[in-house]
A protein has these predicted regions:
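Helix-loop-strand module that forms the ligand-binding subsite of alpha/beta enzymes
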Residues: 57-146
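N-terminal beta1-alpha1 ligand-phosphate binding loop
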Residues: 2-33
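Residues at the starts of beta-strands that form the adenosine-phosphate
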Residues: 3, 29, 34-36, 119-121, ...
């Protein structure tokens, strides 16, 4: 049994992202995993970081991460990034010195040392764009940024990334195939 912490970032309970969340939770629970789901919109998470020290909410989210084996992030990609509420959550929660620290090399130069080693991350993202455009013209920018610029810096190197393209334009049959991928991912987490 694994403890899975889900961070969900979509405002619409009838969105395809909600279907991903619900499918993942149902499948993982049937497999015997323990789920802890954070719905950023329902909890009215304030994504604005103004240099303040971590408050109770951020400290609670960090504790929930510490108690988990797997972090699952579910959100759409809008304008080649996740919604501001998710980006702000990353900025506030997965921040130094808690999630990573810098080891000084020389002068003002250092490199990050992750503090979340041994954890796994699973990222589910939906796109309105077709896969060809994202891979060709935008060089998988959202994927690389999350994998390298967020999770790897925090010490999480086991990152599974599942992307679903052109979601507003695909058939219901194709969406069901997407949800089968979600089920398989939940079974193999």
């Amino acid at each position: 049994m694994k403890k899975i912490f889900i961070v969900y970032g979509h405002y619409n309970d009838r969105s395809f992202n909600a279907a991903i969340k619900d499918t993942f939770i149902k499948t993982a629970e049937e497999k015997g995993h323990k789920i802890d789901c954070l719905d950023l919109y329902k909890e009215n998470f304030n994504p604005v970081f103004s240099g303040e020290k971590p408050g109770k909410e951020v400290l609670d989210h960090r504790k929930r991460i510490e108690e988990s084996n797997v972090i699952v992030l579910i959100a759409p990609i809008w304008n080649f990034r996740m919604p501001a509420i998710v980006e702000g959550w990353i900025d506030k929660v997965l921040a130094p010195p808690w999630a990573f620290r810098f080891k000084k090399l020389f002068g003002n130069y250092g490199f990050p040392i992750g503090n979340l080693k041994g954890k796994k991350a699973v990222v589910f993202c939906t796109y309105g764009s077709p896969q060809f455009a994202i891979r060709t013209f935008f060089l998988n920018m959202p994927t690389k940024r999350l994998r390298r610029g967020v999770f790897n810096i925090c010490g999480i190197t086991d990152v599974v990334y599942k992307r679903f393209f052109a979601v507003p334009f695909v058939s219901q049959e194709k969406r069901q195939k997407f949800l089968e991928i979600v089920k398989k991912t939940a079974l193999n987490v």
